């Protein structure tokens, strides 16, 4: 059974859909690559704190997203809002095993978990894959949960103030089957993932 979103998530998405489609002219491509059912890790480049927004709207209303949010967001009065919006806390700057375990379990339960391998927003002008240090968390979660690892490229979220067009491109799941049992599986999968993300950003 596909997990269902909270009423707050539905409200946010319903209000956001005409805003993103109209004001920001949101366009997406490659949705045919997304698994129709079941959990998976959706990994994208990280331009701004608004990155989950267009991802969620392009999949609404058929699927909804879960994503890590910095632990500072989970203080009253924002905790209930963040949780209802699909977020769960992560302590940035350290290996948060609890957040990783939560993400892995959510994938196993059929959720789509959004990850940003770069960990933090790219500095202005940072575009090439060798300039952005990627973490292996997204690949580790996909490998541990035995779910697809799907790349996405996001363009425009760092220029919302200029009403830049928002574009999202999805790619086919990263090849993981040949990595079974390899100690370097997370690193190799991450290298493949980041190469795919960079191609999607360029073509979005």
Give, region by region, the residue ranges found by the protein language model.
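Helix-to-loop junction immediately C-terminal to a conserved catalytic motif
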Residues: 9, 15-46
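Structural motif corresponding to alpha-helix initiation and N-cap regions
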Residues: 28, 75, 97-100
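Non-catalytic C-terminal accessory region of glycerolipid acyltransferases
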Residues: 2-8, 98-204
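Alpha-helical membrane-targeting segments
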Residues: 1-25, 75-85, 160-163
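Catalytic core of membrane glycerolipid acyltransferases/transacylases, capturing the structured
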Residues: 12, 35-94
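A generic structural signal for well-ordered alpha-helical segments
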Residues: 19-21, 60, 81-82, 106, ...
């Amino acid at each position: 059974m596909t997990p269902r979103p909270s009423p707050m998530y539905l409200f946010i998405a319903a209000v956001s859909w005409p805003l993103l489609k109209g004001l920001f002219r949101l366009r997406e491509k490659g949705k045919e690559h997304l698994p129709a059912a079941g959990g998976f890790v959706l990994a994208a480049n990280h331009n701004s704190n608004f990155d989950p927004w267009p991802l969620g709207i392009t999949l609404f209303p058929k699927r909804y997203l879960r994503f890590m949010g910095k632990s500072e967001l989970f203080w009253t009065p924002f905790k209930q809002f963040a949780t209802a919006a699909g977020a769960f806390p992560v302590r940035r700057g350290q290996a948060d095993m609890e957040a990783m375990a939560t993400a892995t379990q959510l994938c196993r339960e059929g959720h789509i978990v959004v990850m940003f391998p770069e960990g933090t927003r790219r500095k202005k002008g940072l575009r090439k894959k060798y300039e952005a240090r990627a973490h292996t968390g997204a690949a580790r979660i996909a490998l541990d949960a035995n779910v697809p690892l799907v790349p996405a490229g996001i363009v425009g979220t760092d220029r919302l103030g200029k009403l830049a067009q928002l574009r999202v491109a999805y790619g086919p799941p990263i090849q993981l089957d040949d990595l079974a049992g390899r100690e370097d599986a997370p690193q190799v999968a991450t290298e493949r993932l980041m190469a795919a993300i960079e191609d999607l950003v360029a073509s979005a």
